[in-house]
A protein has these predicted regions:
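Aromatic-lined, polymer-binding surfaces characteristic
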Residues: 1-158
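Short alpha-helical segments and helix-capping/turn motifs at coil-helix boundaries
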Residues: 18, 228-229, 263-264
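CBM-like, beta-strand-rich accessory domains located in the C-terminal region of large
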Residues: 30, 261-312
Length: 312
């Protein structure tokens, strides 16, 4: 009920109005702003005047904190959540229009830095494209609800990311385990898209250096692309020329998937060519990795594709 939720929010504000590193963590703060504003009927409606003043002050204070910290955040996903929270705050408060402008500026930079000219992640990570799509659609819906003018670049990038979503999920209805991708279960997202009237199609058999050859019963999907540059290789798996084969909706040949938790040995193992169904050349992994200053693996020696020919 409103009373219970607002009591929790009020207690949080009283305890955490001043900054502390635990409760004002960048990602946590971003999600808290989105949660409180998205559920305003519970967190805000029918509250006392003093509660509303305190609520508005803490939301705007947290949004400014995110804006001051965002350039320090390297992870694209955390930045995307923070940018979304900043934009939502700007849309929710008429006197905070500067947050919309600054949030959109950071969104453009995040897209420009992480996505190529065709709207696909420079990391070649399929899951990253879905994450970008989800947040851009969320931001688009906020603009519609607020009845404020939406910039064209949001629709443009949703179109390109939708092409990726159709190719890697809608067309095949399973998760291809390439380059950091794991089992994602996008069925709930499909229902969300349908409810909001989004529909994406991609009838091509090649997209962003991945190839999908299929008929009604079988599907062969293959990575035919080069490795990404070092700065985008934190989750890259040395899977060039790796493939998966599906028959009647069931995987017959599959790659290993990506081990994302903090175990260097298992992470390193999941990124070698040896755990892929792959065309092996000279008994070597297609890429070599090294640990950076943060003990994270990144590409040392990558792979370039000089020429390819696909016969469908």
């Amino acid at each position: 009920s409103n009373i219970s939720v607002q009591k929790i929010v009020k207690n949080w504000i009283e305890i955490n109005y001043r900054y502390n590193s635990k409760t004002w963590n960048f990602e946590t703060t971003s999600k808290r702003i989105i949660s409180w504003l998205s559920n305003y009927k519970l967190s805000y409606d029918n509250a006392s005047d003093q509660y509303k003043i305190d609520f508005n002050n803490i939301i705007q204070k947290q949004a400014l904190h995110l804006l001051n910290q965002i350039n320090k955040i390297k992870d694209y996903h955390k930045r995307l959540i923070g940018i979304s929270a900043i934009i939502l705050t700007g849309l929710a408060y008429n006197d905070e229009k500067k947050l919309i402008v600054k949030g959109l500026d950071h969104l453009k930079k995040n897209i420009r830095y992480n996505l190529d000219s065709f709207g696909f992640p420079k990391s070649r990570n399929i899951n990253s494209s879905i994450i970008f799509l989800k947040y851009l659609i969320l931001i688009r819906e906020w603009f519609k609800e607020s009845q404020k003018e939406m910039p064209d670049f949001i629709d443009e990038n949703i179109f390109y990311l939708g092409q990726s979503y159709a190719f890697f999920w809608k067309n095949i209805n399973f998760d291809p385990l390439f380059n950091g991708n794991n089992i994602s279960n996008n069925h709930e997202f499909d229902l969300y898209l349908k409810r909001l009237g989004y529909s994406f199609k991609n009838e091509n058999y090649e997209f962003s250096d991945y190839v999908s050859l299929r008929n009604k019963k079988i599907n062969l999907i293959m990575d035919t692309g080069p490795s990404p540059s070092k700065k985008f290789s934190s989750k890259y798996q040395a899977g060039a020329l790796s493939f998966e084969f599906v028959s009647n909706g069931k995987k017959i040949l599959t790659n290993s998937g990506y081990f994302s938790k903090n175990n260097i040995q298992l992470n390193e193992m999941s990124r070698s060519s040896a755990v892929h169904n792959i065309l092996v050349i000279d008994d070597n992994s297609s890429c070599k990795f090294k640990k950076n200053s943060n003990s994270e693996l990144e590409i040392k020696d990558g792979l370039k594709i000089t020429k390819k020919k696909i016969i469908n």
